[in-house]
């Protein structure tokens, strides 16, 4: 009887270990979960915090919400996973709207309008720029921007994989359709 009980307990312990090992998500599936969450996450219209200007909330809340919904409308394909102990990388191809080109168009238009005299001393420049920027960003129709990025994963002490999606500038730039790259390019041209 003792042998039978010991055997049953041993089998249960083995099954628990086997299920725990199988239940652990791979880096690839954790990245997929993170991407799905980003695409469906509810966003608050907090433009004033983003741009550090409370008046923007009232003026541009709708346009900002529309833009954020477009940002969340990216497509992705998980390409490759490489695991090395407690570290892993997952390659993801992002396809989205070319917000970088829209940003550059906005910048070029503002510069041209300033040179031509369309922007005068009486022009509310901030209002003009934000209206033009949101108009250009929200009018992008095709998902023509494509970039493959590497998401870094780390296994924590609980054996769970975590990602650097929230701090990965390359990923964020891809999700934003190259907008960070466009901003850097414009800033470099001013130097």
Residue ranges and their predicted role:
Residues 83-87, 157-158:
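Residue-level signal for tight coil/turn positions that link beta-strands
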Residues 65, 103-105, 136-141:
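Extracellular/periplasm-exposed beta-strand and loop segments of Gram-negative cell-envelope proteins
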Residues 95-110, 173-175:
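Short, cysteine-centered beta-strand-loop-beta hairpins and adjacent loop/turn segments enriched
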Residues 18-21:
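C-terminal motif of bacterial Sec signal peptides marking the signal peptidase cleavage site
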Residues 23-77, 101:
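Core segments of small alpha/beta cavity-forming domains
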Residues 86-94:
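A short hydrophobic beta-strand element
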Residues 1-8, 12-13:
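Positively charged n-region of N-terminal signal peptides that target proteins for export
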Residues 112-127, 139-188:
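Short beta-strand edge/turn micro-motifs at domain boundaries
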């Amino acid at each position: 009887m003792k042998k039978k009980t010991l055997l049953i307990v041993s089998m249960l312990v083995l099954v628990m270990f086997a299920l725990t090992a199988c239940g652990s998500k791979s880096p690839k599936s954790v990245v997929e979960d993170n991407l799905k969450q980003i695409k469906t996450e509810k966003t608050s219209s907090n433009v004033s915090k983003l741009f550090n200007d409370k008046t923007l909330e009232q003026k541009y809340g709708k346009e900002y919400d529309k833009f954020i919904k477009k940002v969340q409308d990216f497509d992705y394909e998980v390409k490759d996973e490489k695991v090395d102990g407690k570290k892993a990388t997952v390659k993801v191809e992002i396809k989205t709207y070319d917000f970088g080109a829209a940003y550059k168009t906005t910048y070029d238009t503002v510069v041209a309008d300033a040179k031509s005299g369309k922007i005068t001393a009486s022009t509310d420049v901030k209002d003009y720029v934000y209206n033009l920027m949101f108009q250009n960003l929200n009018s992008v129709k095709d998902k023509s921007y494509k970039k493959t990025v590497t998401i870094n994963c780390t296994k924590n002490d609980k054996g769970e994989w975590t990602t650097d999606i929230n701090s990965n500038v390359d990923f964020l730039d891809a999700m934003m359709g190259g907008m960070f790259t466009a901003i850097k390019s414009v800033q470099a041209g001013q130097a």
